[in-house]
Amino acid sequence: YQQDQPLDEQTDSLINFLWSGGVTENTAKVTGQVSMDSDSIRLVVSTRKDLVSSTYSDYKIADSTINNRLVTFDLRSLEPNTQYYYGLEIDNNAERVTNYTGKFKTVSNEPMSFSFALGACSKSGNGSVYNTIANDDILFFMHTGDLHYSDIGSDNINRFRSAYENQLSGTDMGRLFKNTPMAYMWDDHDYGPNNSDATAPGRNSSRLAYQEFVPHYPLDAGSGDVPIYQSFNVGRVLFILTDNRSERTPYRASSSNKTVLGSQQKAWFKNKLLEAQGTYPLIVWVNTFPWISEQGEGDDGWEWYQEERNEIANFIVDNDIKGLCMLSGDAHMIAIDDGTNSNYSNTEGEGFPVFHAGALSRSGSYKGGPYSHGAFPGEGQYGLMSVEDRGGDEIKVVWS
């Protein structure tokens, strides 16, 4: 194989998009969509950019009537902390493989320093912000919700499929995710309509389309019509992504038994926090909408679920959970709180740090607060989180 173009300038009329995710020390997932039916598609993977000395997946079938021409490859037995390149071989045409290639880097379970970008609220798949992110030296991108703004209010899986296709096919976002592995948790506009919850008409279709299109980490609830909460680690950092939409009860209900997470997910979340103690000095909770807010100040955040927020906050304090921070989206702003305003437990003191990062491609808006370091609404914004872990007692984190 011969590499002809920079990775961010490649095009191939046979491939709509490629993206990777679910990256661990020795595994990764690549999902792609092609523009024609084929009964012989395989993934070519190499540690070399020109794809020399490659390994090959088993052959897959792409059929518009069977799988929407989607192909997903689960990669195993990879080497830790290693850069990989990949491409699709379609109909045994080896010459076209390097026309459209992507890359990802595996992680390590040992202490490691790394940086990643995070952001939310992407109404458009095009914009200079995606190209700026692509030029950062990052290990992955964390999308914290509203990957698209289709606001689908019907149980029509083809509408959800089209939403992913429109955002990824031939767009700046698609090029970013081809070359930067991602982790992604939805919020309301990409799960269902505005402010949506478990009563959304398209709940089942949304869940299934996510599992079809997104190269996600294993879903602890299983597969099929299930919530999409998941977790993964990079070195000694544990990431916990909660599904704040598809199990949530309506926020305007008057019952004190309202829930964001649902009983099963909440038990899983608490257990993850307990299991992390002594193993992961840093825990990153990806919570897609505002935690810091008071009832009457917002229309969709945790302020409408004060009893459950208090329960979770008390659990964190009572179990002496250390090293927790939160990444959030939904609000179209950059905002940081150092813990001054995030404690909703019955015990006085500081809470955990909170970082909102957005909007990628949406006009600015302010939600929640107050935030100790201020809030800055705007479009074309994202965050960076840098982790320095030398294996000692402390891990240094910088948000910017």
Regions found by a protein language model. Name each.
Residues 4-400:
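Metal-dependent phosphoester/phosphodiester hydrolase catalytic core
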